[in-house]
Amino acid sequence: MTATPAAPHLREDLLTPRFYTTEIEKAARTSLEDQRHTFEAMLGEMQADYNREHFDRKAPLDRLRDLSPEEKEAYESYLVRSCVSEFSGFLLFKELSRRLKQAGRPELGELFQLMARDEARHAGFLNRALVAEGIAIDLPTLSTKRPITWFPLSWVLYSVYLSEKIGYWRYILIDRHLKANPGNNVAPLFDFFEPWCQDENRHGDIFNMLIRCWPQLRRGIRGKLLSRFFLWSVFLTHSLTVCERGNFYRILGMDPALFDAEVMRQTNRTASRAFPWVFDMESSTYLSLRDRIVDTFRQLKQAKGLQKLGLKLRFAGLLLRQFSQPMRATQAGAEGVLA
């Protein structure tokens, strides 16, 4: 899979998704006994496919407003990263669906099949936007040339939950901003962010239900470490990615740092419904450390020699300080103790 000659600025590493697999046999032992009512409701909602008509295959996606070459590059890079990310999610859900059905769990398999449907729809829609830009990505090739990373089931449940919820807040905050500032809506693609975020939110709720099927994942030191590590790592990745893609958010009239901070605040608040612990962002130095981490990250990209070594040490120290910031217990954690 390659970018077309029309887009030489798109690096090949943007086009390489990560594919994750997990403990399928353990996943097949998921007990739905205590979550049966929630599971049935969510399965019914997914089967109803409320967003089926929202992603119109005939919707024009090629009416960009006048953008400078640098702005166009930022927009296209955003499309590629987002498209590949959605397709990677499709591959994970499709594989889980297939393997769970083979393991004799057809209901769970169907739920993952329906989530795979949504991810494929998103990836296809983004791919159409890329084609409108004259960029061709051979998505089917990704399924035959993908690196596979194995994660324990607990890691997949925590990380995918956060990925879906942070995706929801990213899309909904961009959607709200553009509705309040229509002059910054530079591409028709953004008109579809509201139904898009509904899919992300629904998927996150499903993974919250799956986490509750394994109450031991929210108990004691294990629950606190899982909460701390995945909130920190997902937020760190988001901050550094927004830093690298700052031009994209400025095209939309958004301050990248403020956007990043609000996404983290809202995702952290939402995670309190699923995780036993979340970061205490309001009374800690978490966000001010974020600013220093991003600044050091920028300097690292330009530094050489001994200066780079010193910056790496500073960067590592800042990461450790942020990782160690205070957390607060949640009601979800109390439920995990009682479960």
Model-derived features: positions:
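Non-heme di-metal
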Residues: T2-A339
